[in-house]
Amino acid sequence: MFFAPMPGDMPVTDNPMLHIPDGFLSIAISVVCWLVTLAVLAVAVRRAREEFDERLAPLAGVMAAFIFAGQMINFPVAGGTSGHLIGATLAFVVLGPWLGLLAMTAVIVLQALLFQDGGLVVMGANVLVMGIVPGLVGYGLYLWARGKSHGVQTAVIGAGAWLSVVVAALITALLLGFSGTTSLAIAIPAMAGIHMLIGIGEALITVAAISFIAQTRPAMLQRDKATSGTGWIIGGLAIALIVTLFSPLASAFPDGLEWVAGEMGFLQTAQDAPYEILPDYTLPFLGETAVSTILAGVIGVLLVGGITALVARTIRRRTAAS
């Protein structure tokens, strides 16, 4: 069964919901998600220490910055809904699974702490369904295609990006059902249906990014030949910053999860953040204006890029010292 939203079925909210907010999941499910996420992150840190070259640190920062900027732009999907880039497949393919997961985690944590996008209690769940699950799905398919022709690899990466969104949506539906928030029989087809469309956008963006890298800086796709120099770092950050200029044009329609919550009647269970710093990607003293959104995006891009690169360098230095 496919649930297709119709215009006017659900009002656009003042606070667009891009990630799972507090209140959607039970405490028990949230704790389980935290335990799983922390266990996987512990493995990721250990493996990242063993495997990645320090020259990958700035690449991780640039990738995190681009994904953050990309996630700010919701694109319209079907009458009255929107979607946005997750970016996990892109991060895992370019950085490898371990450093890729750390980059995705940095993005998701910063979004929750600074921009109040995603709950604090359910942060572990957001890392699980936006970082771990989609990244492993997309990267798993990519591993199968390694060594094959460029065309096959590109097609498989696109398919993996699409599938990663659908699987992440299904896992989210399971978490909602097990939390008692809504019925599994309703949540699964509703989440899967709309995210099959959102996944097309994910696939197109991921393939475009990979193709651009392959044409302009192919060494980035070969982690054993990590590129050096500062020109590509400046260029990568410039692209991320340019993307933020388009953030005011993002679709105001609710994203897939928010639409499902409205249709299924549990949208009101979402809890507001206990504090606000740059809520909903705006600077409070500038209000909900285009300039406010752009400046908030610039702050986020620079912070997440710098933090991710710093974490990567710190991991490598600890390895060298041990």
What spans do the regions from the language model cover?
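Short, strongly hydrophobic alpha-helical membrane anchors
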Residues: 1-24
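Individual transmembrane alpha-helix segments
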Residues: 17, 278-309
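Hydrophobic transmembrane alpha-helices
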Residues: 19-23, 31-90
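Alpha-helical membrane segments and adjacent membrane-interface helices in multi-pass membrane proteins
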Residues: 74-135
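Short helix-perturbing small/polar motifs within transmembrane alpha-helices
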Residues: 129-168, 172
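Glycine-rich ThDP/TPP pyrophosphate-binding loop and its adjacent helix/strand module
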Residues: 156, 174-231
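Juxtamembrane non-transmembrane "cap" segments at the membrane-aqueous interface
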Residues: 251-279
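Short, charged juxtamembrane terminal tails flanking transmembrane helices
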Residues: 317-322
